[in-house]
Amino acid sequence: MTVLHSVDFFPSGKAPVAIEPRLPQAAFPEHHHDFHEIVIVEHGTGIHVFNGQPYTISGGTVCFVRDHDRHLYEHTDNLCLTNVLWRSPDAFQFLAGLDQLLPQEQDGYYPSHWRVNQSVLQQVRQLVGLMERAGDGVDAPAVANREILFMQLLVLLRRSSLMEGATNNDAKLNQLMAWLEDHFAEEVCWEAVAEQFSLSLRTLHRQLKQHTGLTPQRYLNRLRLIKARHLLRHSDHSVTEIAYRCGFGDSNHFSTLFRREFNWSPRDIRQGRDAIIQ
């Protein structure tokens, strides 16, 4: 597995934060690094496989990667990221207690992926721009200014994330997308889902298409297929059982959609025939 080292990304041996844009981010094999990372998805879509679990990411997704996490990107479509790299909690001169602003693992579950709305994403861009222009002065005021900007970013993300439960349409769509990640295998009635999240059906369709480039049903199908591909690679369940586990009522229909999406049949994936180009 590829290991990325801080010496290759941080401007100096003492700098606690670095900005690394990926415009766009191509598919990238599994790796980990000796630093922490906040991945901010500007736009586009892709699959983020995080510690072996696949997540669909799009504009507004924010992922918190720790120095012992492993991850990769695949099936990317104009996926543009800004990576905010930071060495460790004890690398800062003026900041303490950062863990209170970061996702925390509880009972083996780490809520690594948050979502923010488009207006917050614009504020994030402005803050990142200030961080990039903050210079590399080593005097106390310059160091403090850079650390303050990083703290402002964490506060903004924390306040604006799905966890804080905002009520505008962007936030409602974020909540809906997070719900789909957990309920993808269920029968989904879009009218009922729209009502559940206090959105009109028309707004749901329009906003999901703007965020992902896909209609709601195509987005759901892709989500199901991604989960199915993960099970094909990492479980012993039969193709038919995986189809049903991932919300498909007919295994033949599942196989047709799967081949159309990935250019491989479920059996090909099960037998590892795609590994050559991974």
Curated annotation (Swiss-Prot):
One GO term (biological process): rhamnose metabolic process
UniProt keyword annotations, A-Z: Activator, Cytoplasm, DNA-binding, Repeat, Rhamnose metabolism, Transcription, Transcription regulation
Site entry (Interaction with sigma-70), positions: 241, 250
Major localization listed first in the record, in broad terms: cytoplasm
Domain named HTH araC/xylS-type: residues: 174-272
PROSITE patterns: HTH_ARAC_FAMILY_1, HTH_ARAC_FAMILY_2
Gene3D superfamilies per record: Homeodomain-like (1.10.10.60), Jelly Rolls (2.60.120.10)
GO CC terms in record: cytoplasm
Protein name from the UniProt record: HTH-type transcriptional activator RhaS
Gene that this sequence comes from: rhaS
